[in-house]
């Protein structure tokens, strides 16, 4: 057994950690579809799913079975290869982006010094998946939806990145673990970077194409947008991917602005995973509450809001942060 070296054991443990974390993320994304329907029913004074199992608890299993057995149909005039690759690229980009999010002091898939840059690289890759889906479907509604989605994502990613430059200026690092530890030694960034938090949260909702920024999938205008031609497991990958995106943005908000796995004032540090999960769940509920309470604006209003309101606010935050950093030196 001389081939079993400490390096090999370390590699195997790292791979197992990555598999466990990514499986938890996928399961959470799938469960969110049921949780959202139940919460929307509660807030809108109706029952929600309540037919399969007690209190509708087995509805998710029924939906998964239905998805598995639906016909995996491809439009006759579609580009079959690109049409198939689009949901795979979308799901892969989301899971790879989650790799740089530290869950606890010891649990995380990858501890990269360029963690923030890696996240934005994967977020940019997801834009290609949306364009692939719309163009390869050979459907005008799908193409319009993909063009809307790509323009919206690229626009909001601009100040999404700028919103985090204030954090980078204060910590001097793109590493997410360094950012979390900096907050433990000083204060959570929600206080000194409040403007950055607001713009990052707005951009996160827009990048995940969630209500009220779901114009790329507007049923009344585009009949579900770029996944109109998808069915079966391909559609399921887009569907679950949307909820994984919610988990990802919520986890990033916790990591970058709310101390990551640390509790308030350093309370009960041994419950690091519980603190991280509770804070992430709060932002997930906030995503669902936005869907239940806000109307959908016009697409031109969404784009004007990004460039005329959010971008100047982000630049103001960056200017103020730079002034404080220079004054502190």
Swiss-Prot record:
Family: Belongs to the complex I subunit 1 family.
GO biological process: aerobic respiration
Function: NDH-1 shuttles electrons from NADH, via FMN and iron-sulfur (Fe-S) centers, to quinones in the respiratory chain. The immediate electron acceptor for the enzyme in this species is believed to be ubiquinone. Couples the redox reaction to proton translocation (for every two electrons transferred, four hydrogen ions are translocated across the cytoplasmic membrane), and thus conserves the redox energy in a proton gradient. This subunit may bind ubiquinone.
Protein's cellular compartments: Cell inner membrane
Pfam families noted in UniProt: NADHdh (PF00146)
Name of the protein in question: NADH-quinone oxidoreductase subunit H
Segments passing through the bilayer: 11-31, 81-101, 114-134, 154-174, 187-207, 238-258, 270-290, 309-329
MF annotations from Gene Ontology: NADH dehydrogenase activity; oxidoreductase activity, acting on NAD(P)H, quinone or similar compound as acceptor; quinone binding
PROSITE patterns per record: COMPLEX1_ND1_2
Quaternary structure note: NDH-1 is composed of 13 different subunits. Subunits NuoA, H, J, K, L, M, N constitute the membrane sector of the complex.
The protein's Enzyme Commission number: 7.1.1.-
Record keywords: Cell inner membrane, Cell membrane, Membrane, NAD, Quinone, Translocase, Transmembrane, Transmembrane helix, Ubiquinone
GO cellular component: plasma membrane
Organism name: Azotobacter vinelandii (strain DJ / ATCC BAA-1303)
Broad class of the protein's primary localization: membrane
Gene name linked to the record: nuoH
NCBIfam families: PRK06076.1-1, PRK06076.1-2
Reactions catalysed, as given in the entry: a quinone + NADH + 5 H(+)(in) = a quinol + NAD(+) + 4 H(+)(out)
Membrane protein topology class: Multi-pass membrane protein
